[in-house]
């Protein structure tokens, strides 16, 4: 990833600048670009891309590969036929910050030649030729255009992170590349020796409308150029997956970093981190501090404790500013970590693993690493998806320490013993080997890939999880065949995103209908306000209404945004969005069809037995059905604390399950 200049993120770079300031700034940026390690190999990289349809570039963080390579490709004519250079990122903050930096380097407003697109935010135009985006967004584009026909080059950045989206995207791009190469005359030539995945994609492309085929005809002699970029030095897995694709290494720019370990194990990592932060602040030289923590709750706790301890220090020692960064933090607040510190002040960045490779924050000279990270795990036998705290891998620890050596010599304080480091695993297990594959299955089906089990993943999922998913998917298909499509999508969209309801909205049918009541009440309040006030005033009144009713306004806004997005997508597909009004029976039958793999029956002692796994659970105390104890329920989520609980619960009729999936559920007396 690039090293971001400290003041890259003002809304208008040229505003309030004199001509001299602008020239000086431009010269400084040009000098920064020339000094990047990748600049020395520009011509070689361009030639490698010309000569190889698939290229793997391994470059340390700070080499300049993310900002410079797309500009090189644009400069050397890779957009000449009207194509776009697309660059995917695992995280939205990286897509935004890099796009802003590249636009500034090009001396143009963001959204013209250079832009970015993330969920709910598209800062691109018809002029955009360099487009940064999240990998999930490119997958959504593939739903409407399976050829990805507008792209001449796609760069998958941070591929070493091996997220679910990245692995699915790599498999999809491998198929797209093959299929586009065969569309010499604008018509796909089906090769029956291809894998089923290829057939599925070809059939889907053949069925697209003429507009997409015409778009492809423009590029009929131009196969898709695919570039995989990784900060990991081991590129073998990517090279082998793409048939022995060539790998090129780009040197980074790394200053020496001194590593410090603890003498004994730390029992309280939060307290150890706080002590280390203040030791650095009070005893070390200039430079900002980057602290790795496991999540939002931990970050907010440490930030609060820092402020409490600062108040106990003399005025002259309080010049310490805290900046959090985690994935759910609003984008505008994430951007604040890149702002320069006021003179005489030191910044402390409190970050999740988002700061390991996705973003490079300038000015960091000190890193505090407790050696922990939150990771998603899945138990296929129990059907439990959990987010747990685990130790980092050696590769992650090295990435973290490297953050201190981007601008000059640095120091990394590992809050564990050196012997503990030696026992860490070499690398992190890919997400696809430790997560629920249900969503992946549905995503691949939506992309037109029927043989999901044999999809060409870069690494096959865990066999136990795969077999459970295969069985579940078979039942899902059978249930779908038996059950007609429900006609009240409007309410289902509301249900899928609502959060945080009050008892006054409670429905005796369960939590899902309670959430629907909350959403409907909020929407009715907003629509009435909009009739007599401006939209801005109506939004303000809605926030107050949320506060008065103890509803999380940010979650409600997120639900409204997603609802609007899904409605737009559904309408583009030609489907009608209707409501079931007050017919809750239909809605509960729809819930049963959606969550039939997550059903539970009441036991004589009042507990519940999950029908497929046999796990004994309780209804969570936050549920409106906690005291009601219906005979049969479906649920969204299973969580483990001192007990196993199910959350987001609705009452259903057991016979609905028998109708939906007779192979799983037998008729009971």
Question: Each PLM stretch: what is its role?
Answer:
Residues 635-636:
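Phosphate-centric recognition/catalysis
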Residues 469, 518-519, 535, 552, ...:
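Short, intrinsically disordered, low-complexity terminal segments
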Residues 469-529:
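Leucine-rich, amphipathic alpha-helical/linker segments
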Residues 315-322, 334, 479-498, 641-648:
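Charge-dense polyanion-binding interfaces
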Residues 525-554:
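N-terminal leader/propeptide and maturation segments of large enzyme subunits in energy/redox metabolism
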Residues 496, 502, 513, 527, ...:
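Amphipathic alpha-helical interaction segments
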Residues 1-474, 540, 544, 548, ...:
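P-loop NTPase motor module signature
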